């Protein structure tokens, strides 16, 4: 009773019989990318139905049949709308839901070989298509592969394939060590089951063991050499009148001797570069289809081997074969066989059917897999789409996880460590982060951080053994050196050289190297920040006005601040970071990015002021422009007589001789020498420096544009994949080198990078260590605790917000964070820097983001047409440590670094500022303000939040950002960290303006793609709940088979391809129709 289909009581009214033209029309219906359904159903255990219950059901069924046509129509229409699970889906649930400790099935490479005549003489198996994710065809010219494209299948071919699986031989988990043994096993099985006549065994075996010709990539010279051969072969094929006839084909199969079959891969297979697209554990699925003249009925076999075996030259690439599908049929249906081969090959590349093929126990499991595929396909009308058009692979593939989870029984399966969305009842944040859970014990968080990071300490060094790490080191090194020089110069101006460029280099090297070696998150880069610089300026002026020793006062502030930071570490105060939502993070990171962009242009404008452009210069009037050095009035000479002047092109003479010697020409002096020795510059062209500003802007914008272009070169169609990846990894270094060479070739005297050449304190009034007592009153040591509180807030906010941004879930970090451990080492380094009078260092947001971007990893083997998948970041300690060691050694590399133009480094600053804004939701929402509604992207928050509410949220964020910018630009910048803290309060106040539903989508740190995934899971659960309630109220118990639509091949074709006979009377009977249709 279980195998009987539910009767379709409307089948008796079926009077239309398909004619031949309608059957042919099925071939023009094409199937595109299938979209997974989102419903699933919980399995229910039902007790067996008793005799009385069966009678009751029969009575209900009879009453149902006696209803009026109107009632039947109403009920049928309502029942159609109910989401029902097909028997195929139910069977797949049990297949995929079984607990299996074995590893996931490997990636499959599927190859379609067709039996074709070669040079009009010999029949061979010729490769015509291949699949990993997408289909690649051998073009009609036969000399090249097509671009990867989405496989479009005729609906008819899928039904024919289903019939093949029903009628053919299914051989699962067989053992074979060679192709002849496997072929003999298949043929013997066909004879035993009565599907093949014994006298045809030799012919079938010979056909299946014919030579395989693969479409391998040839070199240009080889391709040119084969042109003549191809042309001559083609001419013989078209001039031979007997080519393709049955007699000729039979003679081809019997005239030549059987080729030697080798189990080892051939040289062409081993040299095939296509292996780079396959993972190491890949297996092969071979599809062989063809037409022969000695068969009256098709020869069909589907084989799955117990262990994958190398079958010689059967496959284009040297991978072991696990699956083999064979279809040999009578003459006249080559196109149908080809489409069936494409259908099974496409199914083998489908992730769900791929898993079913590995786990299937019998024929019915495989048929259920085909039915599930049919349940998910989308049919395109033939009049609205040309099947000859090749569909480009999408940039992002629909995940098959939903289809698999729907059947495997997993309801709360989380991918890539994702956490379920809170359902709109919270504002996001980091409450689910293990690193931020408060322990309630003394130093509990610090101890947990150490225990979490200790097992990865060794791997943090050998994980850096990759060429990508070298590019990251060079890129971040140049950024760090530039930053150290910039802040060192500003500190020198603010503190009267008590801290200068050399102190900045030394502090950066010491602090950064120690932090990267021992901190919890070594991907974070330490640097001086703007608020620290403002504090240093105010502290120096305060000390100067009150006659305090600046360095001693600063020492005690640093010690108090370090002590307060250690208290925060001991009390697990870093748990407060969980209140830093996307609103706070994006406001802070966007502000720092804008500062980098602003400073880059500010420095270029300042350079243009120093080297002005003479906009009134006229080429034809050169005589109007002059600049001459004239001697000063002798009465005003104040230079001592023993001063000697030595321009490089003049003999050495005393100043007295210079001023009184009438033959001395002052016009030979340079501008610098003229000003140095008291001369006067006269002329309207003295402040004009030709070409420097224009050349500097060329270098500046050129470096930025080149860096952006080369970074995106990975997705370019030019050059092989390895070369594109290498260029992308070294994009910044290549840009710097290119424009350094351009600057050297042009020869314009652009400003260059200046590095201290001597290792000594910038100011002669200080040493390398600061004594804690001596210059200031004793009470200053205690009073320093007050400004230290402000510094502590500054350090805590800068450090922890940057750490939160670095540890975002979209970076897919696997070794965990270490907020408490990071703050601990920042406190220790504050003590060291305070004792040595070095600048204080804290996490730098933009440089840290650039460091992460330079270490991002993607899949090494991507199927043709498939976009590389982001795997995570190369977490290690080597790149940061070497960056800071090189920074310390930069003093000894000054002769090399002096050739780098400063505009090139400013261009790198601009790139870092712009690149760190990529993927920030705040920037996406800013762009929405300029986009018409119809052109707006499909962001998840636009699905659920009204657009005016989105704009209001963006406006408030822009307002906060503007206030922070104004605050940063004034004297009140010292309270900048407090205002960052105020962003948390502003975000809390938004609870009164926005609903929790809106905030859950606008203010969340979960990446967009993950949020969409979670939304689809929520919809699936809702449908599941409604499905269960529908099933509880239905009359049909779940244990019985649910009706499904089946289109049998015998009804679709008057002459099925599997049999030359016409449908029997039984197949035309109403009973037969009832068994193959549904209500």
From Swiss-Prot:
Phenotype upon changing residue 1033 to N: No effect on regulation by cAMP of the transporter stoichiometry. Partial loss of interaction with CA2
Outcome of substituting residue 554 to D: Prevents membrane targeting
Pfam families: Band_3_cyto (PF07565), HCO3_cotransp (PF00955)
Mutagenesis or variant effect for residue 711 to R: No effect on the sodium-dependent ion transport activity
Reported impact of residue 700 to M: Strong reduction of the sodium-dependent ion transport activity
Resulting phenotype, residue 715 to N: Strong reduction of the sodium-dependent ion transport activity
Effect of residue 714 to Q: Moderate reduction of the sodium-dependent ion transport activity
Consequence when changing residue 968 to Q: Moderate reduction of the sodium-dependent ion transport activity
Composition bias type Basic and acidic residues, residue spans: 53-70, 1062-1079
Segments dipping into the membrane without crossing: 961-986
Keywords, comma-separated and alphabetical: Cell membrane, Disease variant, Glycoprotein, Ion transport, Membrane, Phosphoprotein, Retinitis pigmentosa, Sodium, Sodium transport, Symport, Transmembrane, Transmembrane helix, Transport
Effect of residue 721 to G: Moderate reduction of the sodium-dependent ion transport activity
Effect caused by changing residue 775 to N: Moderate reduction of the sodium-dependent ion transport activity
Impact reported for residue 766 to Q: Moderate reduction of the sodium-dependent ion transport activity
Outcome of mutating residue 767 to T: Alters interaction with CA4
Matching PANTHER family: ANION EXCHANGE PROTEIN (PTHR11453), ELECTROGENIC SODIUM BICARBONATE COTRANSPORTER 1 (PTHR11453:SF10)
Protein's name in the database: Electrogenic sodium bicarbonate cotransporter 1
Lineage: Eukaryota, Metazoa, Chordata, Craniata, Vertebrata
